[in-house]
Amino acid sequence: MDDASPLSNPAKEPAALRSLLGRTNRDWWPNQLSLDILHQHGRHGNPMGDDFDYAEAFKTLDYFAVKRDLHALMTDSQPWWPADYGHYGPFFIRMAWHSAGTYRTGDGRGGANSGNQRFAPLNSWPDNANLDKARRLLWPVKKKYGAKLSWADLMIMAGNVAFESMGAPVFGFGGGRADIFEPEKDVYWGTEEQWVGKGAKTRIVEGKAFEDPLAAVQMGLIYVNPEGPDGSPDPWASARDIRMTFARMGMNDEETLALTAGGHTFGKCHGAGDAAKIGAEPEGADIAQQGLGWTSSHESGMGDHTITSGLEGPWTPTPIKWDMSYFHMLLDYKYELVRSPAGAKQWQPVNPKPEDLAPGAHSPDRRVPTMMTTADLAFAMDPEYRKIAERFRDNPDQFADAFARAWFKLCHRDMGPKSRYLGPEVPAEDLIWQDPIPPVDHPLAEAADIASLKAKLLDSGLSVADLVRTAWASAATYRGSDHRGGANGARIRLAPQKDWEVNEPEKLARVLGVLEKVKADFDASAGGGKKISLADLIVLGGCAGIEKAARDAGHAIEVPFAPGRTDASPEQTDVESFEVLEPKADGFRNYLQVRFSVPTEELLIDRSQLLGLSAPEMTVLVGGLRVLGVNHGGSKNGVFTDRPGQLTNDFFVNLLDMGTAWKQVDDKADDLFVGTCRRTHEEKWTATRTDLVFGSNSQLRALSEVYASDDAGERFVKDFVRAWTKVMNADRFDLPRAQRLARAA
């Protein structure tokens, strides 16, 4: 090879060119719309293959054998990373906690549901320092059970067993978390260019709420800075940060305190020496480290010499035993500010009693003082937190129950409804944050009933647009990130969804009134006790509308429909919890509530990813929904057809027509455009960025060309129906996987 080539001498070229591929398109055009998040975790990167069903594999797992192996591992200290106090329990708790703790309610992303802690950036976050060793300790267990036990489930299960092994109460465990095999591209972690401790500043300025959907207060943290906001040892300001960030993770004050107190009953922090002696994180470490990071040159670099957060010491004198000592140490002592050996700011009890000293983590005959972080002291200083802490201290049973429930919620919040939980230790109790729906308690409508109902819906006075728009509004709340939302439950008829601006409350109320009458008539007249839920009827209305629209366009097609949805009650619906599902933008309905700092087409990509759609599926749905007339407020933007209500490919044909010239309506705003005839200069169409992106972006234009072709009519209708069915069934976890994902047989 020529020595002048950058391939033979990388030093001759800048880092951006040190690749066989050279610069990427994104390097040249940083603002280029990326569709990558729609195609992540595809079959080509997944070694398990398309046919692998993790839920079915998990059902064959010897669950209690895994638990026995984990119990044995807790006290099987390894010389390459010895266990503090001879017990790995606290270490695995931190690993599980930090796996689940990235969840945020704003977009449902983060959390433990995919085993994402194995990949960048999480595997190299400062707050996850040394958790690479925890996962390596678990490898023999993962290796033994293979495909039957995902990393995602194993990490949470290890945390659960760790608590059990040290006497803590647990509420249960549900498996079913399938692993990913590449880093997530869809999660927005922030724009900062430095980690916490490396220059990143707090996101909370003057007590004001920080950017949605973020939950952690600094880049690289799971929750808050334990030393206080920006490292300032101010417990009162820390209380504000804690309350804000835990609320964004779906926790109230009681859950926050129970969870923290229970977790900090165990283990210790590590700051034995100069943090400058810590090596690179896993993603930046040398290849010989084999994926391990944070190698320390401080004495042995492990055991009593470990450096992780920089804080040093246990919270309690009994760091591997469930008891009430955390509250005793928190509430019964005065504290003074000190520095750890690594220089971190922490608090030490004043004149601790001998019995309140802790054993050394690797030298049990040595007695060491306990400590509290600034974040811990927030629970003693903040009046509301202190009231809860005192109540827990005086009522150990209340604390135990609150902790067990909060830990279960933390670890399962992103798994969706309880029907997705697997294993013999799933709690029987329904919990409001699981968005429960009642079971089916009646015979379901059969084929003849469904055909009759479709006819009645089409004869009800509701238009195709009414039927399709309502079905879309019901189903499109689904988020694949945490498996919330969707059509099952018919919560579109309940607060808060019935009042959302995007759902056009007056129109929605009119449509629901008609559907409720159709339901009542069917329930009263159907034989054999058969009933139809409103949830099913809403979706069936969409099916009927699409079939009519296709027929009117010359295409006979049956839209798949699977009855079995039920209707949730107001008592099963936490209104505040559902408010985060309200779409502020829905490109499928050409709706934008407020202007965002990012282009509206990026919001369409984001929503499509949450719905589990590919770029072709997104494309065909937008084109079909435009001509069916489901735009918010009856807007004509993007309705590129002279036969609205028919399922045609007119959107694509007219978008790609070179006889039309486009320009912004207002030079000061780039979200509304007018299309005029190049020859006559007459206005033909209006459009938003969400419409025009299908002609301007090269990838989306290539897809649009497929559907705009003269021979594409039938393909367009079939692809639209398949993508539509996928959205309608997104939350039907009771259906076979292939049917739920609307895969062709």
Curated annotation (Swiss-Prot):
UniProt GO BP: cellular response to hydrogen peroxide; hydrogen peroxide catabolic process
Database matches in InterPro entries: Catalase_peroxidase (IPR000763), Haem_peroxidase (IPR002016), Haem_peroxidase_sf (IPR010255), Peroxidases_AS (IPR019794)
Cofactor needs: heme b
Enzyme class: oxidoreductase
Keyword DNA damage: no
Region described as Disordered: spans on this chain: 345-368
The EC number(s) this enzyme carries: 1.11.1.21
Cofactor note (record): Binds 1 heme b (iron(II)-protoporphyrin IX) group per dimer.
Active-site residues per Swiss-Prot or TrEMBL entry: H98
Coiled coil (UniProt feature): none
Signal peptide: none
A Pfam family per the record: peroxidase
Biological function: Bifunctional enzyme with both catalase and broad-spectrum peroxidase activity.
Subunit structure: Homodimer or homotetramer.
Name the UniProt record assigns to this protein: Catalase-peroxidase
